[in-house]
Amino acid sequence: MRRLAFSSSALVLALIAGCAVIVVPEDGNAQIKSAFSSNAVQGNGQVATEQRAVSASVDGIDINGSMLVTVRVGQAPSLTVEGDSNLLPLLRTDASGGTLRVWTEGGVRTSNPLRVTLTVPQLRQAEANGSGRLQVTGLNGGDFDLRLNGSREVEIAGRVGRFDVRLNGSGSMNATALDSASTDATLNGSGRLQLGRLQGQSLGLELRGSGRATASGSVERLRVRLSGSGNADLAGLSSRDADISTNGSGSVTAKASGALVAGSNGSGSITVYGNPAQRSVSGKRVTVVQ
């Protein structure tokens, strides 16, 4: 009876947690396997390295899963993967179509992170889903598109003409070592964008949620749209003309010297430095500092 009571309690807990499968062997000892039971392959602790083929035509990367990825731009193409020797066959790579796809086949468990190192002459785009880290160095003047979904940490360095970044989730991007002439950035969620040094045309920034964004440098045009409780600290970015609006409790700090259009709806605030020559301001919480 005592064993039956325990099994019943476990069954209730499993059903509360989610779908449960009841397995009753011949000895009568019920086993409960929930939908969250892991079938992941355990790493054997024996770290190995593999060289894999990649062509010079690859100029993009698509990452799915938890791994540490490094992309180096500007040298002869190469691809190296590292991890527990029994997990490397599950770390899949496909370089067809000009984009390197990286993913794990099924679940894995290991104390040694899976590592991928890619070297390519050019990198035009990167997409990453899930957790882990992505580091890109040596960007060399072309346009670059970045798409992030999840909690991944990303570092970007080099020089680009146009930078287009979209972040969904709680991840973070540090581009303080990146120089760009024009940037378009969108953040949905609680993540963080450090947009680096802009020098030239424009910054377009959209924040939805509780995320944060920063930028430095100098641009001709600044456009900011903020919805929610987020924060855009752009006081380190000089702009000639600025168009800023907030909806919610978030805040924007910016700098403009030419024409300013600013509107605040809700409890959020806008603070603009630089004494802009032309001003069109609406909302009680818009402040222009001389």
Regions found by a protein language model. Give the residues of each.
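Intrinsically disordered, low-complexity terminal regions
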Residues: 1-290
